[in-house]
Amino acid sequence: MNEQQRLASQQVNSSTKKEEKDYSKYFESVYQPPSLKDAKKRGKEEVKIERDFGLPEEFRNFGTGRKFYIRTYGCQMNEHDTEVMAGIFTALGYEPTFSTEDADVVLLNTCAIRENAENKVFGELGHLKSLKRRNPDLLIGVCGCMSQEESVVNKIMQKNQHVDMVFGTHNIHRLPYILKDAMFSKETVVEVWSKEGDVIENLPKVRRGDIKAWVNIMYGCDKFCTYCIVPYTRGKERSRRPEDIIQEIRHLAANGYKEITLLGQNVNAYGKDFEDIEYGLGDLMDELRKVDIARIRFTTSHPRDFDDHLIEVLGKGGNLVEHIHLPVQSGSTEMLKIMARKYSREHYLELVRKIKEAIPNAVLTTDIIVGFPNETDEQFEETMSLYREVGFDTAFTFIYSPREGTPAAKMKDNVPMEVKKERLQRLNALVNKLAIEKNDRYKGQIVEVLVDGESKNNPEVLAGYTRTNKLVNFVAPKSLIGQLVKVKVTDAKTWSLNGELVEEPIEVE
């Protein structure tokens, strides 16, 4: 996925001297591979907040005359990490390019959540091999979640020796030093921290747009669902301080941003790691209601941590939108237990009831895995019935993909692939059926739309999203891009709505 990149003016200093933690070993070696065994450990070391970072003198104009290209795979967190890396490149003097042919540095920011994502990365590395032959000075790097996996790093070292550098999710702020090492080293530079570092504030960012922004509020996950690699690749749960988050969002609002999405691997576990204050996501959202910005969203939430206080705050409305993404993964209590989700079908349905009671117009979406090891026909039917009972607007659906190093990867799987595909097909048919039924209800309604830009399919048509995250296409002047407008829905499709402009623009109170 290409990134639209703009100039940024700040930079991170990698001086990371610690009173209680010593990471000097990472700086002395250009080969520090990952360890899933170490990544699984959850120590009680204090997580510090580092705020005083600047560009060291040795890196001034380091990238002048050079260009960088970043290809991003996976979730919004990866997209946001790319914004940070683009900021670091820019502060070093590099310029962005949207072509690997023109680049002096190519980074692949990777996703490890499913095998298909990893296959795409290795396919791209194969394409880059010929480019490296034509341009031996080109630096090729692999970063992100795949880099945190031992098997991936071993495969890169053995079969992709044209890769110059590998680094992970915990040491993005070390990019200037990694670039320097890769530029002068004859060997592949591997600097992957198996244990997470501190929370680094004031990192530079080159945001993808000036209408919507992502803001990390926490990092990592401690849930250890049996199928999931994320707790290993992203480390333990670490929350940013609320004052830093609020300051960042106020700054974005002052610069004209209309919508903020709060990010975290398990966003509603926010604040559970604080030892000095009792402060959770509900408290943060309550404070963000007072910020002069049109919309606040968050993703991704875990049903286990979705508490009553958060529901109460979301029910107050205002700039807190009515869309909640609440991954269920399965409708079977037995499957949920094997997945180590730590909730039951009944608990999930009760949570949905509470949400709908507090927010009558709430739109719920979800994630579902089919074909988990030993899933029976009856257990799959429970997923189908739960989907109908909740009445989700849509879902991201997947066939289970084993991840090396996770408990589920060791489970015996007696579900044939043709059965898994048939179940996915049936589930998707239900998802599509309910999606069009839900969208049909919007016909004739007037909805608030934040205009993102031109439609991908027709430059003469504008496109934007409602508060409930419905895509709306309509004809209007391009001067309305970035504005909130009223649109009357005239037609409904499975994944989008068509409409006509009624009123422009809406003032945010």
From Swiss-Prot:
Domain of life: Bacteria
Keyword Transferase in record: yes
Binding site for [4Fe-4S] cluster 2: C221, C225, C228
One Pfam family in the UniProt entry: UPF0004
Cofactor: [4Fe-4S] cluster
Annotated Basic and acidic residues bias: 16-25
Keywords on record: 4Fe-4S, Cytoplasm, Iron, Iron-sulfur, Metal-binding, S-adenosyl-L-methionine, Transferase, tRNA processing
Assigned GO CC terms: cytosol
Cofactor note: Binds 2 [4Fe-4S] clusters. One cluster is coordinated with 3 cysteines and an exchangeable S-adenosyl-L-methionine.
Residue span, TRAM domain: 440-503
CDD domains per the UniProt record, alphabetical: Radical_SAM
Enzyme class: transferase
Region described as Disordered: 1-26
Polar residues bias locations: 1-15
Catalysed reactions, semicolon-separated: N(6)-dimethylallyladenosine(37) in tRNA + (sulfur carrier)-SH + AH2 + 2 S-adenosyl-L-methionine = 2-methylsulfanyl-N(6)-dimethylallyladenosine(37) in tRNA + (sulfur carrier)-H + 5'-deoxyadenosine + L-methionine + A + S-adenosyl-L-homocysteine + 2 H(+)
Binding site for [4Fe-4S] cluster 1: C75, C111, C145
Job description of the protein: Catalyzes the methylthiolation of N6-(dimethylallyl)adenosine (i(6)A), leading to the formation of 2-methylthio-N6-(dimethylallyl)adenosine (ms(2)i(6)A) at position 37 in tRNAs that read codons beginning with uridine.
Family: Belongs to the methylthiotransferase family. MiaB subfamily.
PANTHER family listed in its UniProt record: CDK5 REGULATORY SUBUNIT-ASSOCIATED PROTEIN 1 (PTHR43020), MITOCHONDRIAL TRNA METHYLTHIOTRANSFERASE CDK5RAP1 (PTHR43020:SF2)
Assembly description: Monomer.
Protein's name in the database: tRNA-2-methylthio-N(6)-dimethylallyladenosine synthase
Organism the protein comes from: Bacillus thuringiensis (strain Al Hakam)
